[in-house]
A protein has these predicted regions:
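Bacterial N-terminal signal peptides that target proteins for export
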Residues: 1-10
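Hydrophobic alpha-helical segments, especially transmembrane helices
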Residues: 6, 17, 37-38
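Intrinsically disordered, low-complexity segments
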Residues: 2, 19-20
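Bacterial N-terminal signal peptides
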Residues: 9-19
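Phosphate-group recognition and catalysis centered on beta-loop-alpha active-site segments
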Residues: 23-338
Length: 338
């Protein structure tokens, strides 16, 4: 073989390797853009107008919260009670609150009563969500889960995923019991044939185990905050982790996930828990958690610097109030979205 053929062969070999490597890299590092409560930094949270905004921006997943009304209807709202910082009475007056500043419990209100609140006129935090870019939409109502699924039917080619957080609290039983709560949500999912287009997440891991027993097809995400994993004492585990004692099983995020692997598929932590340089780091890297079979989708990341840092760690997705910023980062560094 003469020198020219050797050089040609070598060039083709290198080019093939580069192309293969690039394809592999793109497949490995594609990122799921999850709009937190729709696009909370740009529009009222957990509203149809906010979800539509997120879809128009190109999210691959809508992340939102669900409660259940007095008449058993799953509605999309973050808190167990009507939040006076987010909603107004229909006449524009402030929400009536109790001595602790809470509005009426979702579970004590019918859907008709829920629909009477204006949840589009207020910005709950002008410092965190400056205007612009955020816009208010007066008279926007709290949507039902069914109404969101009907909105998604208008985008049949987008295959928008839903990340549904169930808002139950083991320390504050202000909702339906977990079985009734979960059953109401599952019924709407099944009615709309969306079991293969949703996952359900919760800080309250007991409800995740219940859902897995009822509908094993649905992917489940274990949420963990910077304190929810901590045991009460040496003999009493955190009430959030379904009986798993963080310190006793090994004291790392991967250790508690291994204890719950029968029903948890996705680890969804506060981003600080998976950042090795942060003092809240729980001892398991993104790669270690993924190698054990779990996807990693942290929350809530609103700065492009942290977005890029977590992308470099290899996370599967990012939950953000500003999906437009995440999309910008992905495009800037030529990283495909899922």
């Amino acid at each position: 073989m003469n020198n020219s053929k050797i050089y040609l062969f070598f060039f083709i070999f290198i080019l093939y390797g580069f192309i293969f490597s690039s394809c592999n890299s793109q497949a490995k590092y594609s990122v799921d853009i999850q709009g937190h409560r729709g696009a909370r930094g740009l529009a009222p949270e957990n509203t149809l107008v906010g979800f539509q905004k997120a879809i128009e921006l190109g999210v691959t997943t809508l992340e939102f919260d669900v409660g259940v009304t007095k008449d058993g209807i799953p509605i999309i709202f973050h808190d167990v009670a009507i939040n006076p910082n987010i909603c107004l009475e229909n006449n524009g007056n402030p929400i009536k609150t109790d001595s602790l500043g809470y509005g009426p419990l979702i579970k004590n209100l019918t859907l008709t009563e829920i629909k009477s609140f204006d949840c589009g006129s207020l910005n709950p935090d002008l410092i965190r969500f400056p205007e612009p870019p955020r816009q208010n939409y007066p008279s926007e109502r709290i949507p039902t889960l069914q109404e969101l699924f009907e909105l998604l039917q208008k985008y049949p080619n987008k295959n928008i995923w839903c990340n549904i957080e169930l808002k139950t609290n083991p320390n504050y039983p202000a909702t339906y019991p977990i079985n009734e709560f979960a059953d109401a949500v599952l019924q709407v999912i099944e009615l709309n044939n969306r079991a293969n287009l949703v996952n359900i997440q919760s800080f309250h891991w007991q409800i995740l185990e219940y859902i897995n027993d009822q509908q094993s097809e649905i992917l489940l995400a274990g949420l963990v905050g910077t304190s929810s994993y901590k045991s009460v004492n040496d003999s009493t585990p955190s009430p959030w982790l379904n009986g798993i004692h963080f310190e006793q099983v090994g004291g790392t995020s991967l250790a508690i996930l291994e204890e719950a692997k029968q029903y948890i598929n996705i680890f969804s932590p506060s981003w600080r828990l998976i950042d090795p340089t942060d003092n809240e780091f729980l001892g398991s890297s993104v790669k270690e958690i993924q190698s054990a079979g779990f996807k990693v989708i942290p929350w809530t990341i609103n700065t492009t610097r942290i977005m890029k840092k977590l992308i470099d760690e290899g996370v599967d997705g990012i939950i953000t109030d500003y999906p437009d910023s995440l999309k910008f980062v992905l495009e800037k560094f030529n990283i495909p979205q899922k």
